[in-house]
Design a protein with these regions (language model features):
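C-terminal substrate-recognition "lid" of short-chain dehydrogenase/reductases
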Residues: 179, 213-242
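Conserved glycine-rich cofactor-binding loop
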Residues: 8, 15-17
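Conserved glycine-rich Rossmann-like NAD(P)H-binding loop of the short-chain dehydrogenase/reductase
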Residues: 29-46
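Active-site helix of classical SDR
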Residues: 123, 159, 167
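Substrate-binding pocket helix/loop in short-chain dehydrogenase/reductase
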Residues: 99-100, 107-112, 194, 205
Length: 247
């Protein structure tokens, strides 16, 4: 049985979607939750209330994941509040999809900063604490697009592929300190982003998936739970795809 009782997790970009599902599932297993998003809103307030109703401590910190200094401030606030940090989930992400010839420098920079630089920011800030503890699990959210690419998503694909190389390198640096680092590569998952697509576009997406359906956010969260728990105590430097056999 998975038990995260007394552990502390920080999840970036967690007010909605996959991050929210991870926060709720971790809380169901006794984990105290700190989470970030770009600003406080109804989603973040509702998640805080829901987490507290599950009997765990919950802390929301509004923060821009792409800001290096802010990431260090967030980690310090988490440690000051909970006394430790056991699990880091780098989940913050955005898209600015367009064909390469139409892509602006700003669209490229925005996606790389939020999706990839944020992983560096938070890992850089969190690893000293985890090294002092001589334990920790780092989980970063990549994507099927980071593995196989996708037309119109060169910036997004580059950011998600970069996460894979970063996590594999980090696992080799930190393994001797009993800190594990892994990535999850979701396929098409039902989130507000995919639900907003026209029905015909979503139908075409589903045709590409051998299991003939989109994934649920909870299905990604279950993999994160495995990677956060002792069930994966000898798993590090891996990329686990959650894509319905799409890749």
């Amino acid at each position: 049985m998975i038990n995260l009782q007394g552990k502390t997790a920080l999840i970036t970009g967690a007010s909605r979607g996959i991050g929210r599902a991870i926060a709720l599932l971790f809380a169901d297993h006794g984990c105290n939750i700190a989470f970030t998003d770009i600003c406080e809103n109804q989603d973040s307030n509702e998640l805080t209330t829901t987490l507290q109703a599950k009997g765990v401590q919950a802390l929301f910190i509004p923060s821009n994941a792409a800001d290096f200094t802010a990431a260090h401030d967030v980690i310090q606030q988490v440690v000051d509040t909970f006394g430790k940090l056991d699990i880091l989930v780098c989940n913050a992400g955005i898209t600015r999809d367009t064909l390469l010839m139409r892509m602006t420098e700003q669209q490229w920079d925005d996606v790389l900063n939020v999706n990839l630089k944020s992983v560096f920011n938070y890992c850089h800030a969190a690893t000293p604490q985890m090294m002092r503890q001589r334990s920790g699990s780092i989980i970063a959210m990549s994507s099927v697009v980071g593995i196989g690419g996708n037309a119109g998503q060169a910036n997004y694909a580059a950011s998600k592929a970069g996460i894979i190389g970063f996590i594999k390198s980090l696992s080799k640096e930190l393994g001797a300190r009993n800190i594990r680092a892994n990535a999850i590569a979701p396929g098409f998952i039902l989130t507000e982003m995919t639900l907003a697509l026209p029905d015909e576009v979503r139908a075409e997406m589903i045709k590409m998936i051998p299991m003939r359906r989109c994934g649920e956010t909870e299905e990604v969260a279950k993999v994160a739970l495995f990677l956060a728990s002792d069930l994966s105590s000898y798993v590090s430097g891996q990329v686990i795809s959650v894509n319905g056999a799409m890749g």
